[in-house]
Amino acid sequence: MELAQEARELGCWAVEEMGVPVAARAPESTLRRLCLGQGADIWAYILQHVHSQRTVKKIRGNLLWYGHQDSPQVRRKLELEAAVTRLRAEIQELDQSLELMERDTEAQDTAMEQARQHTQDTQRRALLLRAQAGAMRRQQHTLRDPMQRLQNQLRRLQDMERKAKVDVTFGSLTSAALGLEPVVLRDVRTACTLRAQFLQNLLLPQAKRGSLPTPHDDHFGTSYQQWLSSVETLLTNHPPGHVLAALEHLAAEREAEIRSLCSGDGLGDTEISRPQAPDQSDSSQTLPSMVHLIQEGWRTVGVLVSQRSTLLKERQVLTQRLQGLVEEVERRVLGSSERQVLILGLRRCCLWTELKALHDQSQELQDAAGHRQLLLRELQAKQQRILHWRQLVEETQEQVRLLIKGNSASKTRLCRSPGEVLALVQRKVVPTFEAVAPQSRELLRCLEEEVRHLPHILLGTLLRHRPGELKPLPTVLPSIHQLHPASPRGSSFIALSHKLGLPPGKASELLLPAAASLRQDLLLLQDQRSLWCWDLLHMKTSLPPGLPTQELLQIQASQEKQQKENLGQALKRLEKLLKQALERIPELQGIVGDWWEQPGQAALSEELCQGLSLPQWRLRWVQAQGALQKLCS
């Protein structure tokens, strides 16, 4: 076994180191014979110490490179480059985090602006609602007394309606005095009696004395007040139908009494038939209803009663003045012409007084009309505000309704999503998996059979059914060019990997990037070598001729020392700047965060935000950047 291994190593050495073609390669039996006996030690020494010129150059270059890497200056430079690379990566990460923070801040500002606008709208609506509630309370307070009066009137009307539903029987005309009278008939009879007494008190003194009674006469005022109170009580306590029926019953009684009184003289038929004639002639004409006549009469009575007190006062004053003037004229006993002039002057004064009173009354009516118009405008404005507020409330309710509907639809969709996903998996993924599973098993079986024929390929990772059964899958899969070293392209890739110092299992598609990277390193080293040669040539030409070797060495040592000091100072300055940059990164983040919290983030190009437009905010940002750069420098 060891002999075969030595023969194989000898064959590989002949091909790789000595460049022997594969066709001219000695057979394995010959190589075994060479490795027998003392030839084994000789060939072992040759394999260990004899190399091709290319390998020797590679080893020398590696030794020089390792020695160059072991120098403290190079190590320090590499460490600084690594630190600079790390700091650049950190600065890039900080820039990315700043961008993310700016986006988050912009989103938060937008959300805060929307929340602020929503809060302002809510406050305005709440203020409008409070004002509307105050106005409604004041209006309710002002309408409380009219509402109470309307309720009392409604109760009275309901009582009247309930009483009107009850039928009242008055009995026959002959037996009216024997039975009990209804209350409505008794009240109507009392009102008619008081009315008759009032008319007697009103007409009898006129017939006796020829002058009208004053309203201040005791008997006249008492009868008038009694009649008014009785009529008011009658209309308040009894429905109009009962009052009308009672009046008809009393009219029938009076008619019966008149008939009975006129029957003895034979005048009943003639006198009674006379008023019936126009009734027969006018029966075809449509007459107004009794209710309408009563309402119209009481309306006229109310207007006259309201005007009666003022007119009576004015009449009393004017009567007193007139009586005084008449007495004075009678005392003076003027002539007829002077008397006529006096009467005309008195009439003129009366007419002027009436005209002035009418003018004042018209002025009061105009003021009242203007006040009513002002109240009407205020009510119309209130109505418009109420309608606008109602429209806003309806729009808000509609938005809330749509939001609730959208939320319910989203919840329903979210509830249905797991089931839909499961159904989709059952409908599409499971049949596809079942259809692919036999093919994958067949391919796996074929792959296992091919692996038995290719023992040099490491395909263990491809034979795993699942990633979690054995070891995690490798990041680099084996290449197909590693089938066998005897393949035409495989040998070239194997030689390239050996030259680059890569492991033999490296995939061929990854060799070219590694070769390109090493090519860049080679170019960099060549540039450094040319720079050093130029520095050496410049140094040789700048030195005066004839200097001894010792002085040259001293000058070189002093220059190297000065270069080391300059390099050390430059590295210290760089390290100090990096530390300052790391210390000022939080300050930079704070400044940028403070600026992003300003209201300029919500400014648009066509609007002003806190008195500044978007270009002005950008100018402020540029100025802040310049100040920050000065601070960092």
Curated annotation (Swiss-Prot):
**Coiled coil location:** 73-110, 375-403, 551-592
Keyword Methyltransferase found: no
Instruction: Tell me the residues on which N-acetylmethionine occurs.
Output: M1
Residue numbers of Phosphoserine PTMs: S71
Compartmental location? Cytoplasm, Cytoskeleton, Microtubule organizing center, Centrosome; Cytoplasm, Cytoskeleton, Spindle
Which proteins does it associate with, and in what oligomeric form?
Answer: Component of the HAUS augmin-like complex. The complex interacts with the gamma-tubulin ring complex and this interaction is required for spindle assembly. Interacts with EML3 (phosphorylated at 'Thr-881').
Query: What is the protein name given in its UniProt record?
Result: HAUS augmin-like complex subunit 5
**Organism field:** Homo sapiens
Gene name, per UniProt, is HAUS5
